[in-house]
């Protein structure tokens, strides 16, 4: 019995020392592995990033805009003001004086008129004299109507000059004043020709200016 206890006491220190040695080896290996798996320090990453971005700047790549510039949007009022300024012509009031190449459509035909309006105002001014002239000239807005009124009034003036000159109801009215008779006669003839010739020119305007990009239209009555 004593021998067994002595042998057991001799074996226990040997086992304890061997177990202690293995435990020390494992503890010494764990710090080495933890040191190998640890991330690099932040300072080294910052230095590498700075070097990379310096290389990007030196290579000529454009810098991205700042956050304030990229996220700043115009307000609704500013956007509407910019849109309104973009639609304002550089020279205001000039487009109204011009008619485009392809703009001789129905609207311009209403401004120019047709032969029916010309003949209507012509006979109104011819039959009703100055009353018909003023009515036809003021009530019509087309070139045909106004030129017809001018032409009809000129022919009406010639008619009344001839009536007064050769009528027996006005004896001696132009005695000694034949120059005045010729003045009114020539004036009426010029008015008649002016209205007729100008209307003929206006009718040919769509064909004459069809090849021009911009055409200024001005009616002088």
Swiss-Prot record:
Induction info: Increased protein expression in neuronal cells in response to Co(2+) or Fe(2+) ions.
Pfam families recorded: NEDD4_Bsd2
Keywords: Acetylation, Cell projection, Endosome, Golgi apparatus, Membrane, Repeat, Secreted, Synapse, Synaptosome, Transmembrane, Transmembrane helix, Ubl conjugation
Interaction with ITCH, as annotated region: 42-76
Sequence intervals crossing the membrane: 117-137, 144-164, 173-193
Xref: InterPro entries: NEDD4/Bsd2 (IPR019325)
Extracellular compartment residues: 138-143, 194-221
N-acetylalanine sites (modified residues): 2
Chief location: membrane
Expression sites (tissue/organ): Widely expressed. Higher levels are detected in cerebellum, pituitary, thalamus, kidney, liver, testis, salivary glands and placenta. Also expressed in fetal brain, kidney and lung.
Post-translational modifications: Ubiquitinated by NEDD4 and ITCH; mono-, di- and polyubiquitinated forms are detected. Ubiquitination regulates its degradation. Undergoes transient tyrosine phosphorylation following EGF stimulation, most probably by catalyzed by SRC. Phosphorylation SRC is enhanced in the presence of NDFIP2 which may act as a scaffold to recruit SRC to NDFIP1.
Motif position, PPxY motif 2: 64-67
Keyword Metal-binding: no
Cellular location(s): Endosome membrane; Golgi apparatus membrane; Synapse, Synaptosome; Cell projection, Dendrite
A GO CC term assigned to this protein in UniProt: extracellular region
Residues exposed to the Cytoplasmic side: 2-116, 165-172
Top-level division of the source organism's lineage: Eukaryota
Domain notes: The PPxY motifs are required for E3 ubiquitin-protein ligase binding and activation and for ubiquitination.
Record note on quaternary structure: Forms heterodimers with NDFIP2. Interacts with several E3 ubiquitin-protein ligases, including ITCH, NEDD4, NEDD4L and WWP2. The interaction with NEDD4, NEDD4L and ITCH leads to relocalization of these proteins to exosomes and eventually to exosomal secretion. Interacts with U2SURP. Interacts with SLC11A2/DMT1. Interacts with PTEN. May interact with phosphorylated EGFR. Interacts with BRAT1. Interacts with KCNH2. Interacts with MAVS. Part of a complex containing ITCH, NDFIP1 and MAP3K7. Interacts (via N-terminus) with UBE2L3; the interaction mediates recruitment of UBE2L3 to ITCH.
The protein's name: NEDD4 family-interacting protein 1
Organism expressing this protein natively: Homo sapiens
């Amino acid at each position: 019995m004593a021998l067994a206890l002595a042998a057991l006491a001799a074996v226990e220190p040997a086992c304890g020392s061997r177990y202690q040695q293995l435990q020390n080896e494992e503890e010494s290996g764990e710090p080495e592995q933890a040191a190998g798996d640890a991330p690099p320090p932040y300072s080294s990453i910052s230095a590498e990033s700075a070097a990379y971005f310096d290389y990007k700047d030196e290579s000529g790549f454009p810098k991205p805009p700042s956050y304030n510039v990229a996220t700043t949007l115009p307000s609704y009022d500013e956007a509407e003001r910019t849109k309104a300024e973009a639609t304002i012509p550089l020279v205001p009031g000039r487009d109204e004086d011009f008619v485009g190449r392809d703009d001789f459509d129905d609207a311009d035909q209403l401004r120019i008129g047709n032969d029916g309006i010309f003949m209507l105002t012509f006979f109104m001014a011819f039959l009703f004299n100055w009353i018909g002239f003023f009515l036809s000239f003021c009530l019509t807005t087309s070139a045909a109507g106004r030129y017809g009124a001018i032409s009809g009034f000129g022919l009406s003036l010639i008619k009344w000059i001839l009536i007064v000159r050769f009528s027996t109801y006005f004896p001696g009215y132009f005695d000694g004043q034949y120059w005045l008779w010729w003045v009114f006669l020539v004036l009426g003839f010029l008015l008649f020709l002016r209205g007729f010739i100008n209307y003929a020119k206006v009718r040919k305007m769509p064909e004459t200016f069809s090849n021009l990009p911009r055409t200024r239209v001005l009616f002088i009555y």
